[in-house]
Amino acid sequence: MIQQALLSVSDKTGIVDFARALHERGVKLLSTGGTAKLLAESSLPVTEVADYTGFPEMLDGRVKTLHPKVHGGILARRDLPEHMAALSEHSIPTIDLLVVNLYPFQQTVAKDECSLADAIENIDIGGPTMLRSAAKNHRDVTVIVDPADYATVLAEMQANNNTVGYETNFMLAKKVFAHTAQYDGAITNYLTSLGADKSHSTRSAYPQTLNLAFDKVQEMRYGENPHQSAAFYRDLKAVDGALANYKQLQGKELSYNNIADADAAWECVKSFDAAHGAACVIIKHANPCGVAIGGTAQEAYEKAFKTDSTSAFGGIIAFNVPLDEAAAQVVAKQFVEVLIAPGFSEGARAVFAAKQNVRVLEIPLGKGVNAYDFKRVGGGLLVQSPDAKNVQPSELRVVTKRHPTPKEMDDLMFAWRVAKFVKSNAIVFCGGGMTLGVGAGQMSRVDSARIASIKAQNAGLTLAGSAVASDAFFPFRDGLDVVVDAGASCVIQPGGSVRDDEVIAAADERNVAMIFTGTRHFRH
């Protein structure tokens, strides 16, 4: 039974209401510093820990709760007579509920102006110590580190005469150890990222020891293949607009491949500014098989679908604008695995309600960029910054005698945006705000060019006057000749080959405009 609680929080969300509910249930309140002041100002009877222990806070608040009367009351096992006798001998009451969250270390070090001294002062000592003590003794002590759990604990106390059951206590204890591990990991990441110089003026983006924290969202029926097991974890620091922030409105449980493909679709469609019109991306096996922009979501979808209607079967479809009923009616005619948008009208929701197997995901648009991209290798982890660079007009360099027309320039920039999301080697034909042919994942660039041309022919789309993007340079003129033979009138590529002069001469020979971006977009 909970008779005495200690509350000491940095995040004071909901703490007054929770403390008042505890008081109304006859629970004695202990607290420290700012939390005690807030509770007292809220007319709640609270005892300062310094008064409770008879030992004042010292060292500018560094020592508040590190006292046997606190930790003895938390750690004593109620089922061991010798533990209870020791408490009695030293006049130590039990502490049955601990509510603690920690100094905001991660928020502090995220600030550009943060110094090492600032970071050190925000390393919590007493908080983690109490949390670990309470979590260790979870058979007898309820411990809360997350304000979201106040309601759960209070409801259980109200239903069971101030008692919280073992299952809830165990769940809360696991949450504590995950939280303190993450907290210590953040400290390690920060300290090992600092340079060895005494001023610590340099800080690496890649700490010597890298600690990552993820929460399990779901276990899956299987992984990439049926013989593989799998689960999906959410980054505790997932940025705004990340796929992991999805809300599933309907449909079957997402599979491993659904999530992988949905991420590719969502990242691609987010790269198109909704302020300039609707965009639609159709993904199959993590590659775009159709991308388009239009005045409406319906127009964008219909154009994207034309690129490769065969591959679009059972694909993942993403929009950068809310989906209305008109677009939903058209999309619903096809077999769709996953549908993603930042919102859905009531009419659109009603259309897909009749197709309950379709997984419908709502994700808010966001500009945030992940700190890292990861790739697992045998016995290690490759870590890099995300490929978030958008080429600026000032970085473009026309290298041919003929300059692209304004229409060609629009098509080139569209093609370049798409090529970034196509597996290397990538060749993308575009025109009129849509993809016309996509060549992906080939070992030679010329083969990707040939495949992209064939895909356009199969779809009945003309490549005359089209724009072509290549994610990396043309190593020889053969790739350029293939796309020009297919009908391309302009090309955008990074440049950087030892044979750039040969490729430029070939473009001039064929009266093709060509732009170098100076940026490569390999994707593996």
Curated annotation (Swiss-Prot):
PROSITE patterns: MGS. Gene3D superfamilies: 3.40.140.20, Methylglyoxal synthase-like domain. GO terms for biological process: 'de novo' IMP biosynthetic process. Disulfide bonds: none annotated. Keywords: Hydrolase, Multifunctional enzyme, Purine biosynthesis, Transferase. One of its GO terms (cellular component) is cytosol. Its EC number is 2.1.2.3, 3.5.4.10. Pfam families: AICARFT_IMPCHas, MGS. It catalyses: (6R)-10-formyltetrahydrofolate + 5-amino-1-(5-phospho-beta-D-ribosyl)imidazole-4-carboxamide = 5-formamido-1-(5-phospho-D-ribosyl)imidazole-4-carboxamide + (6S)-5,6,7,8-tetrahydrofolate; IMP + H2O = 5-formamido-1-(5-phospho-D-ribosyl)imidazole-4-carboxamide. InterPro entries: AICAR_Tfase_dup_dom_sf, Cytidine_deaminase-like, MGS-like_dom, MGS-like_dom_sf, PurH-like. Coiled coil: none annotated. Pathway: Purine metabolism; IMP biosynthesis via de novo pathway; 5-formamido-1-(5-phospho-D-ribosyl)imidazole-4-carboxamide from 5-amino-1-(5-phospho-D-ribosyl)imidazole-4-carboxamide (10-formyl THF route): step 1/1; Purine metabolism; IMP biosynthesis via de novo pathway; IMP from 5-formamido-1-(5-phospho-D-ribosyl)imidazole-4-carboxamide: step 1/1. Residues 1-145 form the MGS-like domain. GO terms for molecular function: IMP cyclohydrolase activity; phosphoribosylaminoimidazolecarboxamide formyltransferase activity. The IMP cyclohydrolase activity resides in the N-terminal region. Belongs to the PurH family. This is Bifunctional purine biosynthesis protein PurH. It comes from Ralstonia pickettii (strain 12J). The gene is purH.
